Amino acid sequence: VAYPTGSDTMYHIFRGDYVYNSIKEGSWYPIYNSMWYNGVEIMRYWAPLTAYYMALCQMIAGGGQLAGYLIFVGSVCFFNSISWLIIGRKMNRPYLGAFVGLIWFFMPNNLLALFVEGNLARSLCMIFLPVFIYAVCEYLSGRKRIYIPIIIVTFALMAMCHLGYAGMIALAVLIYCIVYMFQQGNKRAVLEVIVSILLGFMVLGIWLVASL
């Protein structure tokens, strides 16, 4: 078996390495990469957060690309568990949260994204997805205002990892909200959740508009 596995893994490693070396040279937002295809705007069509996180992992690894990848995999597993542990404590079910946190990384879809597809951006989204879904459900049930900024921030972070995946999540939540509205009749809460997701998109406007 080749190491590291994943169809797109080396693309993410290369991009993280390019950002890492650009930052070392004083360029914190590299725009153009002449080594990719016939030259490409590396931050225009691909969400930037994964590249910066890969660069951070490479820095922690002392500059080693593959060591940085291993740190990425380990940190995704760790932060996935932390997300579920926090949710479990909030729901007064810490043991259930800890159990789900342990198995979340090993769910078939998550393993497929990380080790078969090599979609490190989607794997990074998995850290924020449980918190986002939890915040949406809690707001719909109790309309506590504290969950609004959590929805906005977590959705924006997912969009900064993988814009297309964030769009699919937004569509799934929209369908859920429509069903919830017909069942519970709480149109205002549903509208506020949808507006919060739209605000998550709007926060990224300075990058999002230019990337389209």
Regions found by a protein language model. Name each.
Residues 1-212:
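Membrane-embedded transmembrane-helix bundle of lipid-linked glycan/lipid transferases
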